[in-house]
Amino acid sequence: MFEKLKISLIEAPIIKKGDYNYFVHPITDGVPLVDPDVLKEAAEGIKKFGNLNVDKIVCVEAMGIHIATALSIITGIPFVVIRKRQYGLEGEVAVHQITGYSHGELYINGLKKGDKIILVDDVVSTGGTMIAVLKAMEKMGIEIVDVFAIVEKGEGKYIVEGETGFEVKSLVKVNVVDGKVQIEGSRDEN
């Protein structure tokens, strides 16, 4: 299961951002080319292993958008994008996020107290974005039913779980060793 996803990850180039090993992959970066079969595998994986007893799918701009779109199409569940741009809409909530390689503001719109959601993202690595977004949604009274990243890298999953109490599911666990992506496990092996 997830063979195309795994192969595409193994073949992904690595770039350094300071001390951070960053792999460049279509699901996590939108470049060089997004293979619809890989995207479909990812969406089908969330559909199979995620809890979709929700009102809305939530993703974070930018690399969660195509995942949420594909999942929305195959499930019929609408999605909300947490944006990097402020709109000033009524009820908008600003969130400060810090990752291993950037920081900035995110803005939540389209969610209200009592909404049941699944948060989907491309990768959990340092955990900074997920922690900030989960804490903000919890403060808003959003019912977080599930949290899902396509790719798990490093200790980010455990950092998020420790900081928020929410389990983070993933399809594939990877690490960068000697300048290459290595698959350390996948949900289909559990």
UniProtKB/Swiss-Prot annotation:
<dbReference type="GO" id="GO:0052657">
    <property type="term" value="F:guanine phosphoribosyltransferase activity"/>
</dbReference>
<dbReference type="GO" id="GO:0006166">
    <property type="term" value="P:purine ribonucleoside salvage"/>
</dbReference>
<dbReference type="InterPro" id="IPR029057">
    <property type="entry name" value="PRTase-like"/>
</dbReference>
<dbReference type="GO" id="GO:0005737">
    <property type="term" value="C:cytoplasm"/>
</dbReference>
<dbReference type="InterPro" id="IPR026597">
    <property type="entry name" value="HGPRTase-like"/>
</dbReference>
<dbReference type="InterPro" id="IPR000836">
    <property type="entry name" value="PRibTrfase_dom"/>
</dbReference>
<keyword id="KW-0808">Transferase</keyword>
<comment type="similarity">
    <text>Belongs to the purine/pyrimidine phosphoribosyltransferase family. Archaeal HPRT subfamily.</text>
</comment>
<dbReference type="Pfam" id="PF00156">
    <property type="entry name" value="Pribosyltran"/>
</dbReference>
<dbReference type="GO" id="GO:0032264">
    <property type="term" value="P:IMP salvage"/>
</dbReference>
<comment type="pathway">
    <text>Purine metabolism; IMP biosynthesis via salvage pathway; IMP from hypoxanthine: step 1/1.</text>
</comment>
<keyword id="KW-0660">Purine salvage</keyword>
<dbReference type="InterPro" id="IPR050118">
    <property type="entry name" value="Pur/Pyrimidine_PRTase"/>
</dbReference>
<comment type="subunit">
    <text>Homodimer.</text>
</comment>
<protein>
    <recommendedName>
        <fullName>Hypoxanthine/guanine phosphoribosyltransferase</fullName>
        <ecNumber>2.4.2.8</ecNumber>
    </recommendedName>
</protein>
<keyword id="KW-0963">Cytoplasm</keyword>
<keyword id="KW-0328">Glycosyltransferase</keyword>
<comment type="function">
    <text>Catalyzes a salvage reaction resulting in the formation of IMP that is energically less costly than de novo synthesis.</text>
</comment>
<dbReference type="GO" id="GO:0004422">
    <property type="term" value="F:hypoxanthine phosphoribosyltransferase activity"/>
</dbReference>
